[in-house]
Amino acid sequence: SLRDVTELNAYIRENEDQRMIAGLIYIDNYDEVMESVEEVRQSLLVALIDRKINKYIGDVDGIVKKLEKDKYFIVLRKDAYKKLKEDKFSLLEEVKQVNIGNSRSATLSIGLGLNTATYALSYQYARVAIDLALARGGDQAVIKDCNGITYFGGKKEQTAKNLSIIHISEP
């Protein structure tokens, strides 16, 4: 019946919305930003940037794990990604506004891997996406899925040093 089909479609959509997305966030210019602020304020600057990233991802019920001083691993649901996409990844601008006397603004690169069969492949896609974001000069979000690449933000076209991009195809 039509009701059964409607109900089935609702379950399919809900299942799709709950799919996990792996992502990476890098502070593009960490060293330059740290050098541009007094030493006594460096830990505060890092804490403010950390807080912005944690709040932004936390607000969509995502998880953030700091991997290194300038690298973060994130996990979110597909419906959370839709919200970030709608607000055009406002975190990119929010982090640039963090100023406690630093003469250089911090910029971020965000890489997300979408619509994959496995979590491992989502992470591989996220790594390809972050490499592309860095190769294009940072300050942008790059989304990789099985259909291709989508870019948000980023004005500077440039090639990164020592960058090799490996194309990963789904089995």
Short names for language-model regions:
Residues 12-13, 89-92, 115-140, 158-162:
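Catalytic-core segments of nucleotide cyclases and related cyclic-nucleotide turnover enzymes
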